[in-house]
């Protein structure tokens, strides 16, 4: 009976089901019971918990009988589960912080609503001013629907009547203060109308007589309440737009500022000096009604103060030091030169670039726009050009890394990237996409004409190539073919100093190519000896001359430290292709030099040290006779003697006729 075979032949129906009694029910706590089966053979307990554990019943909506075949007791329902405790009540919201009335007024209009096409800006007492002819009108009348490009608010400001005269008066009285008397008057009058101080970047409203602090937002509150959008920085003379929330650049305003400063400095340098300046100010006051003493409500502006600031007469906005990020002096000196080219300055500060790249963060022209804004922001702390360096590494991989690089190589690389990223800004008007007229080509691109003359038939083959700079060989024992250099002394005489003009003459001389470099003539169709001559077919606006001071002859590498003199003014007429053609035709040369061939020295980049270990610095001209020395983060005023005695590696000349415009 205990064997496996006997257990398989047994039938469960032969075992009678005992009736439930109190003996075969086992208590399981909480009043629930479980039926206990009678003792049966071990072979029949195939469903015992020791052999096969009982499956856990699936949860159902209602409990059913747990007996087999409808026999047995129903299990009582389980006790109801306790409901979860309610979540804690959230803490009450903090009370709103009480703000000042000025703060609420400055944040009230987050999105400007529709504005009228024209509006009139009045002075603080809402009175009207009269011109010198007696006609009554507002101080400035602004039309907000003008100006499609650049800052539309500046364009609207220029629509107003007498805006040039009023702006010129502000520059004369409050910005270009050249004499002790004018500086004294400025220290007394130019104070904040709200806090009565002059230390927090004082700005003057261009639409009325109001001075306010920029740091403490007093000028912002005035602009918010009066809708006067433009103000001028009294320290640097730059214009701030409250609608654009940035400093803006305008060519017409810049011209007025420059003319006013030149006029004042010219009067101060005259023999009469202060008297001429005072006479000018008196005449301007008679013609204009824009004066701090004209209104009773603004008499607080002219109260004398014990403390007053000192104002230097040199205008140095734009000259800002650049941090050296690790052997990046070659980049810093090129950036200082590029940011002071007048046409580039006008282009980038006027926001004329239209980025067409899918990733504007990789556009070098967009980064240069931000760099120009940082250089002309008036901030005197050195700028960190890390983003510019990163983009150069991306687009010019041969310059990646913190190794020492060549400044001339970096100049060509950055001009090439700027040219590629700004092609959409200046396509030729005729629709020829092959003829690029971008800002880089417009300023730097010239053309070299190469003439190959056959020695047999005298046929000339001409090739014209564009160029961004001109590399000039230096005289000396390291230059091929210079054994009889003009630097050698003869008969005990002192050697003559080589100039930039001598290098240009050597560059444009006819060169015999020799028998080892025979070229097939296009006319006689035979390989013959020929001569080669380079001339300038087209002159650029900014001419860059590269003095080749680094030479590699076999395994030898050396730097040529020969002194090369360079003039402040340069005439490029003798080196033009048209001049050569006139000489060959026997035509007389005119004594009058065309204005487009005259150049003025604009910047000089110097290399100090050896070929293996060196450093780059630059001299940059701001005005006619004002030169500054830029050595990474240090910018100082330089003398003409320091400039002309420098060694010279890259020389930048600007066309005089365009520079004067």
UniProtKB/Swiss-Prot annotation:
<feature type="binding site">
    <location>
        <position position="228"/>
    </location>
    <ligand>
        <name>Zn(2+) 3</name>
    </ligand>
</feature>
<feature type="binding site">
    <location>
        <position position="205"/>
    </location>
    <ligand>
        <name>Zn(2+) 3</name>
    </ligand>
</feature>
<feature type="binding site">
    <location>
        <position position="195"/>
    </location>
    <ligand>
        <name>Zn(2+) 2</name>
    </ligand>
</feature>
<keyword id="KW-0158">Chromosome</keyword>
<keyword id="KW-0862">Zinc</keyword>
<keyword id="KW-0378">Hydrolase</keyword>
<dbReference type="InterPro" id="IPR028889">
    <property type="entry name" value="USP_dom"/>
</dbReference>
<keyword id="KW-0833">Ubl conjugation pathway</keyword>
<keyword id="KW-0479">Metal-binding</keyword>
<feature type="binding site">
    <location>
        <position position="222"/>
    </location>
    <ligand>
        <name>Zn(2+) 3</name>
    </ligand>
</feature>
<dbReference type="InterPro" id="IPR001394">
    <property type="entry name" value="Peptidase_C19_UCH"/>
</dbReference>
<feature type="domain" description="USP">
    <location>
        <begin position="320"/>
        <end position="656"/>
    </location>
</feature>
<dbReference type="Pfam" id="PF02148">
    <property type="entry name" value="zf-UBP"/>
</dbReference>
<dbReference type="GO" id="GO:0010564">
    <property type="term" value="P:regulation of cell cycle process"/>
</dbReference>
<dbReference type="InterPro" id="IPR038765">
    <property type="entry name" value="Papain-like_cys_pep_sf"/>
</dbReference>
<comment type="function">
    <text>Specifically deubiquitinates 'Lys-14' (H2AK13Ub) and 'Lys-16'(H2AK15Ub) of histone H2A regulating the DNA damage response at double-strand breaks (DSBs). USP51 is recruited to chromatin after DNA damage and regulates the dynamic assembly/disassembly of TP53BP1 and BRCA1. Functions in DNA double-strand break repair also by mediating the deubiquitination and subsequent stabilization of DGCR8, leading to the recruitment of DGCR8 binding partners to double strand breaks such as RNF168 or MDC1. In addition, promotes the deubiquitination and stabilization of the transcriptional repressor ZEB1.</text>
</comment>
<dbReference type="GO" id="GO:0140861">
    <property type="term" value="P:DNA repair-dependent chromatin remodeling"/>
</dbReference>
<dbReference type="GO" id="GO:0042393">
    <property type="term" value="F:histone binding"/>
</dbReference>
<feature type="compositionally biased region" description="Polar residues">
    <location>
        <begin position="21"/>
        <end position="30"/>
    </location>
</feature>
<feature type="binding site">
    <location>
        <position position="213"/>
    </location>
    <ligand>
        <name>Zn(2+) 2</name>
    </ligand>
</feature>
<dbReference type="Pfam" id="PF00443">
    <property type="entry name" value="UCH"/>
</dbReference>
<dbReference type="InterPro" id="IPR013083">
    <property type="entry name" value="Znf_RING/FYVE/PHD"/>
</dbReference>
<dbReference type="InterPro" id="IPR001607">
    <property type="entry name" value="Znf_UBP"/>
</dbReference>
<dbReference type="GO" id="GO:0006281">
    <property type="term" value="P:DNA repair"/>
</dbReference>
<feature type="active site" description="Proton acceptor">
    <location>
        <position position="615"/>
    </location>
</feature>
<feature type="binding site">
    <location>
        <position position="151"/>
    </location>
    <ligand>
        <name>Zn(2+) 1</name>
    </ligand>
</feature>
<keyword id="KW-0234">DNA repair</keyword>
<feature type="region of interest" description="Disordered">
    <location>
        <begin position="1"/>
        <end position="144"/>
    </location>
</feature>
<protein>
    <recommendedName>
        <fullName>Ubiquitin carboxyl-terminal hydrolase 51</fullName>
        <ecNumber>3.4.19.12</ecNumber>
    </recommendedName>
</protein>
<dbReference type="InterPro" id="IPR050185">
    <property type="entry name" value="Ub_carboxyl-term_hydrolase"/>
</dbReference>
<dbReference type="GO" id="GO:0006974">
    <property type="term" value="P:DNA damage response"/>
</dbReference>
<comment type="subunit">
    <text>Interacts with H2A.</text>
</comment>
<feature type="binding site">
    <location>
        <position position="218"/>
    </location>
    <ligand>
        <name>Zn(2+) 2</name>
    </ligand>
</feature>
<dbReference type="GO" id="GO:0003682">
    <property type="term" value="F:chromatin binding"/>
</dbReference>
<dbReference type="GO" id="GO:0004843">
    <property type="term" value="F:cysteine-type deubiquitinase activity"/>
</dbReference>
<feature type="binding site">
    <location>
        <position position="192"/>
    </location>
    <ligand>
        <name>Zn(2+) 2</name>
    </ligand>
</feature>
<feature type="binding site">
    <location>
        <position position="153"/>
    </location>
    <ligand>
        <name>Zn(2+) 1</name>
    </ligand>
</feature>
<dbReference type="GO" id="GO:0006508">
    <property type="term" value="P:proteolysis"/>
</dbReference>
<dbReference type="GO" id="GO:0016579">
    <property type="term" value="P:protein deubiquitination"/>
</dbReference>
<dbReference type="GO" id="GO:0005694">
    <property type="term" value="C:chromosome"/>
</dbReference>
<keyword id="KW-0227">DNA damage</keyword>
<dbReference type="GO" id="GO:0140950">
    <property type="term" value="F:histone H2A deubiquitinase activity"/>
</dbReference>
């Amino acid at each position: 009976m205990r064997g496996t075979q006997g257990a398989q032949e047994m039938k469960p129906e032969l075992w009678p089901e005992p009736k439930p009694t109190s003996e075969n029910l086992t208590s399981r706590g909480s009043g629930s019971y479980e039926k206990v089966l009678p003792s049966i053979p071990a072979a029949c307990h195939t469903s015992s918990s020791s052999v096969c554990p009982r499956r856990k019943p699936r949860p159902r909506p209602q409990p059913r009988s747990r007996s087999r075949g409808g026999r047995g007791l129903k299990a009582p329902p389980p006790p109801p589960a306790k409901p979860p405790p309610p979540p804690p009540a959230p803490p009450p919201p903090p009370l709103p912080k009480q703000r000042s009335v000025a703060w609420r007024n400055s944040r009230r209009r987050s999105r400007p609503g529709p504005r009228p096409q024209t509006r009139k800006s009045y002075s603080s007492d809402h009175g009207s001013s009269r011109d010198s002819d007696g006609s009554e009108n507002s101080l400035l009348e602004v039309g907000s629907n003008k100006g499609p490009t650049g800052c539309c608010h500046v364009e609207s400001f220029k629509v107003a009547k007498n805006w040039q005269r009023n702006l010129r008066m502000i520059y004369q009285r409050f910005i270009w203060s050249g004499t002790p008397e004018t500086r004294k008057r400025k220290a007394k009058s130019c104070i904040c109308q709200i806090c009565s101080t002059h230390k927090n970047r004082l700005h003057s409203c261009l639409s009325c007589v109001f001075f306010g602090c920029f740091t403490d937002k007093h000028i912002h509150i005035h602009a918010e309440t009066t809708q006067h959008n433009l103000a001028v920085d009294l320290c640097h003379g730059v214009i701030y737009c409250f609608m654009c929330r940035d400093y803006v650049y305008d060519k017409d305003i810049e011209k007025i500022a420059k003319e006013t400063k030149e006029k004042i400095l010219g009067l101060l340098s005259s023999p009469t000096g202060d008297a001429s300046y005072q006479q000018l100010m008196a005449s301007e006051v008679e013609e204009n009604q824009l004066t701090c003493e004209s209104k009773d409500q603004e008499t607080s502006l002219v109260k004398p103060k014990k403390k007053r600031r000192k104002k230097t007469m040199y205008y140095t906005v734009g000259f800002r030091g650049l941090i050296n990020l690790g052997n990046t002096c070659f980049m810093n000196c090129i950036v200082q030169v590029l940011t002071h080219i007048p046409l580039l300055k006008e282009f980038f500060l006027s926001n004329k670039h239209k980025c067409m790249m899918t990733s504007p963060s990789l556009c070098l022209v967009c980064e240069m726009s931000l760099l120009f804004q940082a250089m002309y922001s008036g901030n005197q702390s050195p700028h960190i050009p890390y983003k510019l360096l990163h983009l150069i590494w991306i687009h010019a991989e041969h310059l990646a890394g913190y190794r020492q690089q060549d400044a001339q190589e970096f100049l060509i690389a950055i001009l090439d990237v700027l040219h590629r990223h700004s092609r959409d800004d200046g396509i030729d008007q005729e629709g020829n996409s092959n003829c690029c007229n971008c800002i880089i080509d417009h300023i730097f691109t010239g053309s070299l004409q190469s003439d190959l003359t056959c020695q047999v038939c005298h046929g000339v083959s001409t090739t014209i190539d564009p160029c961004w700079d001109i590399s000039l060989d230096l005289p000396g024992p390291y230059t091929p073919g210079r054994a009889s250099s003009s630097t050698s002394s003869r008969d005990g005489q002192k050697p003559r100093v080589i100039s930039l003009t001598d290098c240009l003459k050597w560059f444009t001389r006819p060169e015999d190519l020799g028998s080892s470099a025979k070229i097939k003539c296009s006319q006689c169709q035979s390989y013959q000896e020929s001569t080669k001559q380079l001339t300038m077919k087209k002159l650029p606006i900014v001419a860059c001359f590269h003095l080749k001071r680094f030479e590699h002859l076999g395994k030898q590498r050396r730097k040529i430290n020969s002194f090369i003199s360079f003039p402040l003014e340069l005439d490029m007429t003798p080196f033009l292709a048209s001049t050569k053609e006139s000489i060959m035709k026997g035509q007389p040369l005119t004594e009058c030099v065309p204005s487009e061939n005259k150049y003025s020295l604009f910047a000089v980049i110097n290399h100090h040290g050896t070929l293996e270990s060196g450093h780059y610095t630059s001299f940059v001209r701001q005005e006619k006779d004002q030169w500054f020395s830029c050595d990474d983060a240090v910018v100082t005023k330089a003398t003409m003697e320091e400039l002309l005695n420098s060694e010279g590696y890259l020389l930048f000349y600007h066309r005089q006729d365009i520079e004067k415009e």
